[in-house]
């Protein structure tokens, strides 16, 4: 099942879940997450897609953090049909990315040093500044957990706690950014070549998600072939696919024969296809580098297969 029952004779409550370094980081996550969410909901305020994303990210991270701390403290994680080490490592990395994004977006769109006009006034400004500070602290709390639980070189660990496993979460997150730019009037349907790039992004994203799900559910040991070898082969193919997209997408979007080499002067901000194409191109190279790093690290990892 991928989970491990606690040995008999131990207490029902595990105090180390809140007193250990990792436990302390998780308690701080709850404190900072609840404070940030409360400040924004009470007087800070939010609006639009950006504000909704921030609140959703904080709410999601807080809810799962409560689940993790509760299961660790009561030892109920041993009853779950999943690999607990893989689950907590994957969630900590995802929460780090989400909280980092929200910690950048909220101050950028909602925080100003000058007081807004009434009825909001300086009170709303102060709440937004405080929420921005606690959002940054929340990111640091999740990043601390990732640093504390990451597998060290030569250490036998769950796959998602290795650098390769953590990179899988980052790759999927970057792919979501690419998808967001694609659907925002990127005009990817004009050429078969750019449609091929979309297929590459989708295929690699789905394969990465499958690897993460298999690890979290604890089914990496019954695939008929070694899981680490399968991951290396997939990562190598992903590097080749992303390499093709890294060449094709800029050519068909920014070459004068097919697209615009520079941003059109009459292109409106916030709804300019060229901007979306630039975002896709930039994060294509980011993900290519992530897959190359993943391939390099996956050559030397050792992790515990789960059944």
Swiss-Prot record:
Domain of life: Eukaryota
InterPro entries xrefs: Marvel, MYADM-like
Disulfide pairings: none
MARVEL domain ranges (all copies): 17-154, 159-303
Segments crossing the lipid bilayer: 53-73, 90-110, 129-149, 163-183, 198-218, 232-252, 278-298
Cellular localization per UniProt: Membrane
GO (cellular component) term, any one: membrane
Family: Belongs to the MAL family.
Protein name: Myeloid-associated differentiation marker-like protein 2
Species whose genome carries this gene: Bos taurus
Gene name as annotated: MYADML2
């Amino acid at each position: 099942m991928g989970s491990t029952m606690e040995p008999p004779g131990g207490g029902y409550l595990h105090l180390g879940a809140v007193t250990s370094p990792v436990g302390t980081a998780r308690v701080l996550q709850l404190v900072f997450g609840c404070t940030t969410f409360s400040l924004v909901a009470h007087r800070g305020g939010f609006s639009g897609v950006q504000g909704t994303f921030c609140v959703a990210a904080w709410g999601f991270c807080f809810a799962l953090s409560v689940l993790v701390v509760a299961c660790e403290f009561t030892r109920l994680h041993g009853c779950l049909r999943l690999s607990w080490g893989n689950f907590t490592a994957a969630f900590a990395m995802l929460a780090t990315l989400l909280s980092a994004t929200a910690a950048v977006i909220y101050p950028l769109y909602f925080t100003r040093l000058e007081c807004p006009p009434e009825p909001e006034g300086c009170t709303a400004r102060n709440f937004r500044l405080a929420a921005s500070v606690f959002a940054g602290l929340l990111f640091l709390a999740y990043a601390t957990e990732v640093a504390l639980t990451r597998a060290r070189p030569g250490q036998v660990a769950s796959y998602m706690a290795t650098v390769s496993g953590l990179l899988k979460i980052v790759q999927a997150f970057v792919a979501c950014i690419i998808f967001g730019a694609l659907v925002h009037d990127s005009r990817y349907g004009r050429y078969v070549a750019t449609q091929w790039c979309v297929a590459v992004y989708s295929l690699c994203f789905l394969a990465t998600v499958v690897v993460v799900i298999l690890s979290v559910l604890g089914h990496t040991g019954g695939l008929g072939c070694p899981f680490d070898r399968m991951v290396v082969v997939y990562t190598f193919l992903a590097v080749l696919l992303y390499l093709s997209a890294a060449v094709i997408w800029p050519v068909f979007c920014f070459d004068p024969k097919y697209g615009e080499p520079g941003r059109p002067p009459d292109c409106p901000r916030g709804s300019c296809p060229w901007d979306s194409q630039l975002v896709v191109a930039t994060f294509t190279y980011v993900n290519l580098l992530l897959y190359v790093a993943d391939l390099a690290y996956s050559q030397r990892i050792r992790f515990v297969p789960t059944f």
